[in-house]
Regions:
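Substrate-binding/access-modulating region of protease and related hydrolase catalytic domains
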Residues: 1-60, 89, 106-114, 118-120, ...
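Structural recognition of the beta-strand scaffold that forms the well-ordered cores
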Residues: 1-2, 32-34, 39-43, 65-68, ...
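Solvent-exposed loop/turn segments at secondary-structure junctions
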Residues: 4-7, 46-50, 71-74, 85, ...
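Secreted peptidase-domain scaffold signal
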Residues: 45, 169-184
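Hydrolase catalytic cores
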Residues: 54, 98-160, 164, 168, ...
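Structural recognition of alpha->loop->beta junctions
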Residues: 56-72
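Internal glycine-rich alpha/beta core junctions
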Residues: 80-100
C-alpha cells in the first residue's frame, strides 16, 4: 500500500507519461514479482481529489491488481486515484471499500477509516481466499478472473476499472472453465 508521485526534488516528480509500468523502479520490481508468480495487490493511491488524480506507482505496473476505493454503497471515494496508464491499460483494476472501512485500532475499538490503503488489503484478503479455493490457477489467471468477475467487466473504465468483484461469481466462472476444459 505504498505509492508516490512527488519527491523532495520536484525535478524528479513523475509525469503522466511516466505511468507506463516501466519507468518507476517500484513498478518494475512489482511487475517482476508478478512475473515470478506472486499475486501483487496495490493501492491505487489517494490523489483523486488533488491536482495529480492518477494512480501512483507501483499501481501502474503490469500484472498487478490495482485497487481503488468506494464507499459501502459502491460510490467512488473522491480521493481514490484514477487511471488509465500512459500506455492505455485500465487502472485501477477493481474497487473495494476504502471510504468508511471498518478497522480495529490499537485500543481494540472498531472505527471507520479512509484510504486505498484499506481497500487494497480488503481485496487482497478476498483474492487470497479465492486462490486458496482455486490453488491450480497461476497468479495471472487469478487476477484475470478477478477482473472478469467485476460488475463493470463488460465496459471497464479509468475510474472504477472492472468494478466491484463478485468473488462467488469468480469462483463459479473458474469452475465452469475447469469443467469445460476437463470435458474436452
Amino acid at each position: 500500500s505504498l505509492g508516490y508521485y512527488a519527491f523532495d526534488d520536484p525535478s524528479k516528480d513523475y509525469r503522466y507519461c511516466d505511468l507506463d509500468g516501466k519507468f518507476a523502479l517500484m513498478s518494475r520490481q512489482a511487475a517482476k514479482a508478478a512475473d515470478k508468480g506472486m499475486v501483487i495487490v496495490c493501492s491505487a493511491g489517494n490523489a483523486g481529489s488533488g491536482s495529480w488524480k492518477k494512480t501512483t506507482p507501483p499501481g501502474d505496473a503490469e500484472n498487478v491488481l490495482t485497487v481503488g476505493a468506494i464507499n459501502k454503497q459502491g460510490v467512488l471515494a473522491p480521493f481514490s486515484s484514477i487511471g488509465n496508464t500512459a500506455d492505455g491499460r485500465v487502472k485501477p483494476d477493481v474497487m473495494a471499500v476504502g471510504l468508511g472501512s471498518d478497522v480495529m485500532g490499537t485500543d481494540g475499538i472498531v472505527r471507520g477509516a479512509n484510504g486505498t490503503s484499506f481497500s487494497s488489503p480488503i481485496m487482497c484478503g478476498m483474492v487470497a481466499c479465492l486462490w486458496q479455493a482455486l490453488p491450480d490457477l497461476t497468479a495471472k489467471e487469478l487476477i484475470e478472473l478477478v477482473r472478469r468477475s467485476g460488475d463493470r467487466a463488460d465496459s471497464p473504465d479509468n475510474i472504477y476499472g472492472y468494478g466491484v468483484t463478485d468473488m462467488w461469481k469468480a469462483y463459479q466462472l473458474a469452475m465452469k472453465l475447469k469443467a469445460d476444459t476437463d470435458g474436452k
